[in-house]
Regions:
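Mid-chain, well-packed structural core segment of small domains
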Residues: 83-123
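NAD(P)-binding Rossmann-fold cofactor-contacting core
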Residues: 45-46, 53-73
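Cationic, low-complexity basic patches in intrinsically disordered or flexible, solvent-exposed regions
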Residues: 4, 8
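A charged, well-structured terminal subsegment
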Residues: 148-154
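Rossmann-fold NAD(P)-binding glycine/threonine-rich loop
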Residues: 121-148
Length: 154
């Protein structure tokens, strides 16, 4: 049996600024299956595209978001300009953009009542975190969805 530490649990105080509840990344990835991937690229060698393909292969519905290639197709999915323009349900906003863009992204995501704002590895933004918390959006930063799936769902 594989020994796991508690690193897969994040205190909700880290996500919402509240105490006493735990948010389990495994539960998030198991229960939320609709993902807006912000920073999607047509370049198949880019990390965002590799992760998008992985998520699709794992059964997630992934909506690529990139305002420079609106209407084009990445891995069989039409590209949107903003999260709020997506015409299907979105649970998780997975961000592959610089930290300073996170505020604009979370403000847009609020419009469609997303459940999770997930900033990829090396992406952090304290103001985006505050905005997410104020709107009861689970905030995760500096973590890769692909890596977390490999840890907890395989």
């Amino acid at each position: 049996m594989q020994k796991r530490g508690l690193q897969h649990f994040l205190k909700k105080e880290d996500l919402f600024g509240k105490i006493n509840n735990m948010v389990n990344i495994k539960d998030i990835l198991s229960n939320y299956k609709n993902i807006a991937l912000v920073g999607a690229s047509k370049d198949l060698n880019k990390t965002s595209t590799i992760v998008m393909k992985y998520l699709q292969n794992y059964g997630y519905k992934v909506y690529p978001v990139n305002p420079t290639i609106i209407g084009q197709v990445i891995l069989g999915e039409r590209v949107y300009g903003k999260v709020s323009e997506i015409d299907g349900p979105v649970d998780i906003v997975d961000v592959f953009r610089p930290s300073d863009e996170a505020i604009e992204i979370v403000n847009d995501a609020i419009k469609i009542n997303v459940k999770v704002l997930w900033l990829q590895l090396n992406i952090k933004n304290s103001e985006a975190k505050k905005i997410a918390e104020a709107n009861n959006i689970i905030y995760i930063e500096d973590k890769c969805t692909k890596i977390e799936i490999e840890k907890y769902l395989n």
